[in-house]
């Protein structure tokens, strides 16, 4: 087969603790990753000329900075293959929202081209290629819900119960580097264990240490959190934001909450005495047990 159309799922950080900082400036984290069925779609078609062609545009992202292109070229260098690919991308995951869209696209590129080109790298080999592309890329190659430590490379699979999520996107762009460099960021959270996390397994476990910084710096995000709480929805930020999520036991409950919030927003928009901050409901999504392409890699 010479072409694939494959998904690149979003991730949520169910909690995110900053427990320290290395001498090189990288932060030491503890977090739990879960994939959801909100996903980008990538199209790969083999080329015999060795070129990597990008059949899409990402606003503000040059081809040399595109993680998809970088992932493809990294795999070429590592394997010595002379094959190339024409790559298409349909974005559904909000860019820069803390949902790992770019990282997921890069991981799907490594997985799909490893199969398309027949380069035969193992999961651990692909994960070694993934880490230089970004701290979140390895977990998508790992392919399971995971408890992560270090800078994101120390991953342990965890079994999570079924759950659904409503994802909210505030009208704010949050630069990750600025949040991690903020002097008010707490960097000494007490470490937790996997057992601590698995004993509770609720959306109330721990916290996101980046969230207070984002709420202080971005009124669009703090306003969305406040408005949603006032209307019965308790949310948490994923990653460095700005996207927020609420957890539900089942997808129908998440869909119902989405419909109720949408109706309330519609009424508020028509009534001058009621306002709500700018945000959109991205999608009611199901939590996944594993990455859709997990079985494409030899362990």
From Swiss-Prot:
Keyword Kinase: yes
Pathway the protein contributes to: Isoprenoid biosynthesis; isopentenyl diphosphate biosynthesis via DXP pathway; isopentenyl diphosphate from 1-deoxy-D-xylulose 5-phosphate: step 3/6
Broad class of enzyme this protein falls into: transferase
UniProt catalytic activity: 4-CDP-2-C-methyl-D-erythritol + ATP = 4-CDP-2-C-methyl-D-erythritol 2-phosphate + ADP + H(+)
Record-listed E.C. numbers: 2.7.1.148
Keywords carried by this UniProt record: ATP-binding, Isoprene biosynthesis, Kinase, Nucleotide-binding, Transferase
Annotated GO MF terms: 4-(cytidine 5'-diphospho)-2-C-methyl-D-erythritol kinase activity; ATP binding
GO biological process, one term: terpenoid biosynthetic process
Pfam family, one: GHMP_kinases_C
Keyword Lyase assigned: no
Binding sites annotated in the UniProt record for ATP: 94-104
Active site positions, chain numbering: 11, 136
Function statement: Catalyzes the phosphorylation of the position 2 hydroxy group of 4-diphosphocytidyl-2C-methyl-D-erythritol.
Family affiliation: Belongs to the GHMP kinase family. IspE subfamily.
UniProt protein name: 4-diphosphocytidyl-2-C-methyl-D-erythritol kinase
Source species of the chain: Bordetella parapertussis (strain 12822 / ATCC BAA-587 / NCTC 13253)
